[in-house]
């Protein structure tokens, strides 16, 4: 049994102890990720700080546009809700993993901040992905629920923007 109160011996990569839910298709797999969705920026020295600051800035930007009435369509409102869930989920995880773990209690503020990471755990195998990234053996990069919320929000924001544009064109043609 793994002791998840200590950092993994190899750093913040995969703990490589999958729990197969649907064989060869879906598994739970604990992965420590200092980067963002799908491991982008993971293992870099700048990622923990940048990916702590960027979501905070994003929250202020979302608030600004919300007050300006930028999210009129139901798709856009749902997207903002999902985006906030994703931001707060990953932000909470990153702060908790950097500051609340027992092994970091004697570290300085900046050392703790630089140790922050999110826990990704959803791993799925896609039939075509090994053709794109042969080294993946078909396994999509491990992600978490917050990453899913952010990705779905991006699609909904795009669709909401299209719907709002269509509504404006119809209103102007009347």
Language-model segments: what does each one mean?
Residues 1-174:
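Alpha-helical transmembrane bundles and membrane-interface segments of multipass inner-membrane proteins
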């Amino acid at each position: 049994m793994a002791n998840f109160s200590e950092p993994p011996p190899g750093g913040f990569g995969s703990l490589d102890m999958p729990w197969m839910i649907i064989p060869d298709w879906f598994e739970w797999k604990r992965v420590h990720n200092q980067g963002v969705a799908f491991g982008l920026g993971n293992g870099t020295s700048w990622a923990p700080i940048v990916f702590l600051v960027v979501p905070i800035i994003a929250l202020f930007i979302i608030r600004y546009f919300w007050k300006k009435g930028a999210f009129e369509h139901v798709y856009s409102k749902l997207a903002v809700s999902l985006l906030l869930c994703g931001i707060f989920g990953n932000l909470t995880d990153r702060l908790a993993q950097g500051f609340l773990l027992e092994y970091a209690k004697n570290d300085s503020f900046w050392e703790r901040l630089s140790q922050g990471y999110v826990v990704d755990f959803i791993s799925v195998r896609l039939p075509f992905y090994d053709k794109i990234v042969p080294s993946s053996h078909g396994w999509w990069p491990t992600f978490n629920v917050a990453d899913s919320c952010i990705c779905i929000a991006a699609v909904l924001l795009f669709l909401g923007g299209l719907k709002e544009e269509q509504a404006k064109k119809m209103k102007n043609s009347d």
